[in-house]
From Swiss-Prot:
The keyword Chaperone applies. Keywords: ATP-binding, Chaperone, Nucleotide-binding, Stress response. It comes from the Bacteria. GO terms for molecular function: ATP binding. It comes from Mycolicibacterium smegmatis (Mycobacterium smegmatis). Acts as a chaperone. The lineage of its organism: Bacteria, Bacillati, Actinomycetota, Actinomycetes, Mycobacteriales. This is Chaperone protein DnaK. Transmembrane segments: none annotated.
C-alpha cells in the first residue's frame, strides 16, 4: 500500500504494507 501510495489513510493508521 505504501509503495503504491493508494492506501494513504490505511498506511498511516494501520501502517499496512
Amino acid at each position: 500500500a505504501r509503495a503504491v501510495g493508494i492506501d494513504l489513510g490505511t498506511t498511516n493508521x494501520v501502517x499496512a504494507v
